[in-house]
Amino acid sequence: MGRTSRTTDPDGAPYRWELFATKTARVVENELDRCLRERCTTQYEYDMFISRVEARLERASQGGLGGSDDEPSPDPVVSQPALWETRWSFKKRRELRLYHGEPLSVPDLLFGLKYHWKRLDGLSADEIESAQNAEMAEAATRYRASSCYSSADEQPHPN
């Protein structure tokens, strides 16, 4: 049987978020800021989006995601078995994605790896899939380069 995301398991909570960073940059934190600045037209809209993101991350840290259509549990990333995908849908077809890892060696960690907007406008279905797969691959590369990654994290997700 495959794994389910920690973000849906309150028995193991609380979990802690750690965001991928380098010695010189808060990479994932900066990605989220860049994503929101790119798409938000007012400070109010930025603040609203960031509050929705932070609220979901807090619920995830308590193992409280899933169970509703408004806030589904993270989906396993089939092409990158060590990753999970959390989705936010904002008005005007704006689809924010976060890929995270859940290292088996660190049972209380949710490791944020990559934020991006899913590109939809003017692209074919194949182009959308290719662009998203590239984002997933970048997240997987970051994870594999981290000290908390192990090959055991690559267990296939359930179908």
Task: Please state what every model-predicted region is.
Residues 1-95, 105-108, 117-159:
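Basic, Lys/Arg-enriched alpha-helical interface segments
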Residues 113-114:
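Active-site-proximal beta-strands of protease catalytic cores
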